[in-house]
A protein has these predicted regions:
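A general structural motif
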Residues: 1, 84-85, 129
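NAD(P)+-binding Rossmann beta1-loop-alpha1 motif at the extreme N-terminus of oxidoreductases
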Residues: 1-63, 122
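Rossmann-fold dinucleotide-binding core
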Residues: 4, 93-150
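Short amphipathic alpha-helical segments
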Residues: 17-19, 41, 73-76, 100-104, ...
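Active-site-adjacent beta-strand anchor residues
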Residues: 30, 64, 92, 134-135
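Short gly/ser/thr-rich secondary-structure transition/capping motifs
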Residues: 42-48, 72-73, 113-116
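Rossmann-fold NAD(P) dinucleotide-binding segment
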Residues: 51-112
Length: 150
């Protein structure tokens, strides 16, 4: 996969995105507090001005934000600019009904979705030892498995 996006650079997302950059992935990142993206820029990531700009250049977008509503708002901002077939991977801890709703909503627009919450806390995120619980199509999982292993 040529270009990946990462949305949400908090306690969990920042180290997760950092591992992607460290493993050689071409990462474009965004955070609602722009200063949180600066350390990632220094590692070699591109920082997008907004979610639309991120979605326009990425084949897969990983989200790690706080709540169902945050995921929904991010998806609303990204889908108009994203290419058909873009794969959205949500690492946020969302409700099962929200995850199903995101999948349905994205599928209807020609996008793909994996629900992939993580466990292991901030220590696991920094160490690169998180456990992921991935729900979605096996084919989509196989596409991003090498990225998730980073």
């Amino acid at each position: 996969m040529a270009k990946v996006g990462f949305v949400g650079l908090g306690v969990m997302g920042a180290p997760m995105a950092g591992h992607l950059v460290a493993h050689g992935h071409d990462v474009t990142a965004w955070n609602r507090t722009p200063s949180k993206a600066e350390p990632l820029r220094q590692l070699g990531a591109t920082v997008a001005a907004d979610l639309s700009a991120l979605a326009a250049v990425c084949e897969a977008v990983f989200l790690c934000v706080a709540r169902d509503e945050d995921v929904s708002q991010c998806l609303d901002a990204m889908t108009p600019a994203a290419s058909p077939g873009t794969l959205f991977v949500d690492h946020s801890t969302t409700s099962p009904s929200a995850a199903l709703g995101f999948h349905q909503r994205l599928s209807e627009k020609g996008f793909r979705f994996l629900d992939a919450p993580v466990t292991g806390g901030s220590m696991g995120a920094r160490a690169g030892t998180l456990t992921l619980f991935v729900g979605g199509s096996k084919a989509d999982f196989e596409v991003v498995a090498p990225i998730l292993q980073s």
